[in-house]
Every structure is written in C-alpha cells, then in structure tokens.
Amino acid sequence: MTPAQEDEVLARIAEGLVYTESEAASQNSERRTEQIFDYNHTPPREEGRRRSLLVDILGSVGERTVLLPPFHAAFGSNVHIGDDFFGNVNLTFVDDVDIRMGHGVMIAPSETLTTTGHPVHPARRVDFARFSEPIVIEDKVWIGSNVVVLPGVRIGYGSVIGAGSVVCRDIPSMTVALGTPCRVVREITDEDLTTRLAGR
C-alpha cells in the first residue's frame, strides 16, 4: 500500500466509514501486544514497573491511576486515561480509534469498551470489514460490572451506568442509566449526597 493509499484509509477510519482488515494492516506496528502481556504478568509488588509499562502501553496516563490486571486492548496506544482513574480486572479496550476517559473515572470488573462494529449485511463483512468511532467517558463517571460500551458513545460528567448495561447511545451528565439498551432512569441530585445506592 502506498503512503497516499494509507492516508486515504486513515481518513475513512476517522470518518467512521467501513474499512477492511487488509487496509488496516499498516497500523499493526502501533499494537502493544507484548507490553500488555508483560503488564498482565507483573507481580503486585512491582508497582513501579507496572506504572512504567502502562505509560509505554497507553496513549496517555494521568496521575494516581490504577488498572488491575488482566486487561486487554487491540492497540493500547489509542487509550487515554485521566488522573485518579480506577479500572478493575478484565477490562477490554477495543481501541481501533481513541477511547478517552477523564479524571476520577471508576470502572468495575469485566467491562468492554469497543470503538469498532461491523456492517449488518454479510456481503459487506468480507475481509473482516468494520467501522470505528471514538468513545468518550467524561470526568467522575462510574460504570458498573459487566457493561458494554459501543462505538461512538459519550458518557457525560458524573453519570452512573448500572451493571450489565449495553450502552449504545450517548448518556447525559449527572444521570443514572441502566439496561439493555441502556436508558436514563433518573437524574443525580443533591439528595444523593445523603444516600448510598443509585436506586434509593
């Protein structure tokens, strides 16, 4: 593939248009597969090495971040996390394009954040054809266990996503949302300063 052809593919990817596995092959050098393997096998006592590996793997890493192994990523280099981030075990980033998380984000076990989907018609899925759209998770979002966040979603400031949800559309700030598909069930208000659970 010529440089001009690579630029054309990257432009299509950036626009959320369909592209194939063969067309995406030029991006393989950006994958952090070996470093992710090393991170997932780092002893808990080696916090400094774990931090160093995470800085090498991800596109950007804030201060006071915790990402418990194992985690998985298509690239790693397209993931950006802010300060005071906490990610629990079995977090999967399908980061064919950017996944950006703000400050104070908390993510429970067994999440999938996927920027990539595939065409519905089988004739369009030749050569693993797909499309990719970035995910944005704003500051102070809390995502419950076993949630799937789909391509192009933005979750607004301070919101809570209930366990087991499939988030396929944007969620506004300061709301509680849950379900499959994920829907807003209520706003977060000052009354929640004196309660413990989202449903009470």
Which residues are covered by each model-predicted region?
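Conserved catalytic segment of ABC-fold P-loop ATPases
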Residues: 156-159, 172-174
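Conserved metal-binding segment of the jelly-roll/cupin
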Residues: 161-164, 170
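Terminal amphipathic alpha-helical/low-complexity segments used for targeting or macromolecular assembly
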Residues: 1-64, 182-186, 190-200
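Acidic, glycine-centered active-site loop in nucleotide-sugar glycosyltransferases
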Residues: 171-173, 178-181
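Flexible, glycine/small-residue-enriched loop-and-beta-strand segment within the central core
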Residues: 44, 71-154, 180-198
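Short-chain dehydrogenase/reductase
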Residues: 142, 160, 176-178
